[in-house]
Design a protein with these regions (language model features):
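Structural preference for alpha-helix termini/caps and helix-kink/transition segments
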Residues: 279-282, 286-406
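NTP-dependent nucleotidyl-transfer catalytic core
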Residues: 1-253, 257-268, 282, 328, ...
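Basic helix-turn-helix/winged-helix DNA-binding cores
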Residues: 273-274
Length: 406
């Protein structure tokens, strides 16, 4: 049994008690990819994926890429690169980085643009059910049918709203405004009501929205629909960085309830990585890129080990010392695993599995391998007790459970 921290209940839970595990991790908006904050999040859920597989579960992992969104459009305008080209470039770079870092790819990886027809149907369904409403648009917006207006979710139709993040009203209002919300939009029933369908605006991309009119999807409904179509509703777990807890996961779960049977049973969040004293973020520009480290000749497995040295729920600051420690650990492990025989690995494997089963405790798992490596490299150890093939057993376990290729 793999127990993880459920952000909604602040308890450790078995997120997938049956023979299957279905989970969704919110993907990137493809500009400034892939920084170490991204990598830390996706390596966290890769550990969970591996632990579930090792436990014998049939795992289905679904993710998305938000390949049309305001920040992407703003970056494209600022750089003069067409937004589709920018999204494609950054998405491919993200794929390359994840492959280099040993992250198992999702079974289904859907772009926001690709999901537009499904989102249109979902928003129409919410309108018909009274879970959404139209808001008039400003002059010049709305294309050939401005009277249709933008569409917003009506949170008053969801009595369970707020149960994911469990925040007070003032905190929700503050975070909603900080993280892409529009609390002051005229015509909304409630300041927190989130956008479902944004009507066409001059200079912005738009798609056929059938009865909604031309436009593009809101952020939260995209993930709700992609998760529904890839996993079915409800599903076991939704994850991402802790900054997605509210409003994104709160809103997408609310939308999933409006679409029928609810969203994720468990919400799991990775802590944020800081750099130069601030959270690593695109807006601040204090980013360390996986691709830049790779281009500088850094072994991706050293990057992975540097990230795994911190518990996924902790918030911490990246420094050069983290990378140096990752490189040193990688070199020591490779040295310890170079022989045909070595110390018995039975307890080491059990310790790795136990650590991951206890809230994905990667530092403890690394410590178990360190202890085996220290013994293997000890020139004074009793080699008469060595087990033939033990280094291979440890190497395969490190690969399968920790995602570190040696």
């Amino acid at each position: 049994m793999v127990r993880v921290h459920d952000s909604s209940t602040d308890t450790l839970v078995d997120a997938a008690p049956g023979p299957t595990a279905r989970f969704y991790v919110c993907g990137i908006t493809p500009y400034d990819a892939t920084h170490l904050g991204h990598a830390n999040t996706y390596i966290t859920f890769d550990l969970l994926h591996r632990a579930w597989r090792d436990a014998g579960k049939a795992v289905t992992y679904v993710s998305n890429v938000t390949d049309v969104d305001d920040p992407l459009l703003e970056r494209a305008a600022a750089t003069g690169v067409p937004w589709r080209e920018l999204a494609a470039q950054q998405t491919e770079l993200y794929r390359e980085d994840m492959t280099a870092l040993g992250v198992i790819p999702p079974a289904t990886w859907t772009g926001a643009v690709e999901s537009v027809p499904a989102v249109v149907g979902a928003v129409e369904e919410m309108l018909a059910a009274g879970a959404a409403y139209r808001v008039p648009v400003e002059p010049g917006a709305g294309g050939s049918a401005p009277e249709l207006g933008d569409v917003y979710a009506d949170l008053s139709a969801d009595p369970a709203f707020g149960q994911v993040a469990r925040l007070d009203g003032a905190t929700m209002a503050e975070l909603f405004a900080e993280r892409g919300g529009d609390p002051a939009r005229e015509g909304k029933k409630h300041p927190l009501d989130p956008l479902l369908w944004r009507r066409e605006r001059p200079g912005e991309p738009a798609w056929d929205g059938a009865t909604l009119g031309t436009g593009r999807p809101g952020w939260h409904i995209e993930c709700a629909v992609i998760a529904r179509d890839g996993l079915g509703l409800p599903f076991d777990l939704q994850g991402g960085g802790v900054d997605l807890l509210f409003p994104h996961h709160e809103m997408s779960t609310s939308h999933a309830r409006a679409l029928g049977k609810g969203g994720a049973a468990v919400h799991l969040h990775a802590g944020l990585v800081a750099y130069q004293g601030e959270k690593m973020s695109k807006s601040r520009g204090n980013l360390v890129f996986v691709s830049a480290l790779r281009e500088a000749g850094v072994d991706p497995m050293a990057i992975r080990l540097a990230l795994l040295a911190h518990h996924y729920r902790h918030e911490w600051e990246w420094t050069d010392a983290d990378l140096a420690a990752g490189e040193a650990r990688l070199a020591r492990w490779r040295s310890a695993l170079s022989g045909n025989g070595g110390p018995d690995a039975t307890e080491t494997l059990a310790a790795i599995r136990a650590a991951l089963a206890d809230d994905l405790d990667a530092p403890a798992a690394l410590g178990a391998v360190d202890a085996w490596a220290d013994l293997a490299l000890d020139p004074e150890r009793d080699v008469t007790t060595d087990v033939e093939g033990a280094p291979g057993i440890v190497a395969r376990a490190i690969d399968a459970l920790l995602g570190v290729r040696l």
